[in-house]
Amino acid sequence: RKESSAASDVYKRQEFDQYLKRLGYVFKNESKEIGGYAILKNKKIMLIMDVGDSPSNNFSKFYQSGALSFEIISNGKKLITNSGYFTDKKNKLNKFSKSTALQSTLSIEDHSSCDYKKLDKFSLIVKKGVRIIKRNTIFEDNYWKISGSHDGYLKKFKTIHEREVEFYPEQMKFVGFDKLQRKNNSKNIKFDIRFHLNPDAKVMKTQDNKSILVELEDEGWKFNCESYDINIDNGLYLGIKNSYRENQ
């Protein structure tokens, strides 16, 4: 299990509400799902997870391989984020922005959960998509949970990725759990779990490599992982039209 007390800007909460209202979306069921995303929120926190299948090939030009990736927004500031979409198709960053490595989720052996193929000189579409096998959402005053699993690594690695993210509002604490369900455990596989941060966040790792302290404006959060060491790497935030910023 990985624990995070974490803080969080793709949409500010009010902007996101207006966006949903403009599109005519109204939550009418307990799944809290819109367009393949589970969205849980209160006045301070918003938790968003990608729990939808990849689109069919003809509608996948803008798809990014982010199955079970999630974002956290706290008081209108995004902490945990995906890295954004680079719109200039002639730039190699466009292809890069589609990869699973740029989403806040798990990847295996540096592969994305989807395969892509060329539609024309510059456009890529999904060749082999990803299917969400199961998903579940719990939204109560003092307990939230979004969970799901996908088959994006089933063919290559005979592996199902399962993820759940819990939130305890009274404690302002997130708890996450990732599991690789494998049909054949005889061969070790390398996996990475990435959490991309707001480029304005300041981070510091503790000496035991088990915790990271995150400062974002007037909020401070602590990310813990007891089972594995945590590394801080430099990355790119592409959520700026045809531009980017460095993040971690």
Model-derived features: positions:
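Carbohydrate-active enzyme catalytic cores, enriched for enzymes
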Residues: 1-81
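CBM-like, beta-strand-rich accessory domains located in the C-terminal region of large
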Residues: 1, 5-8, 85-248
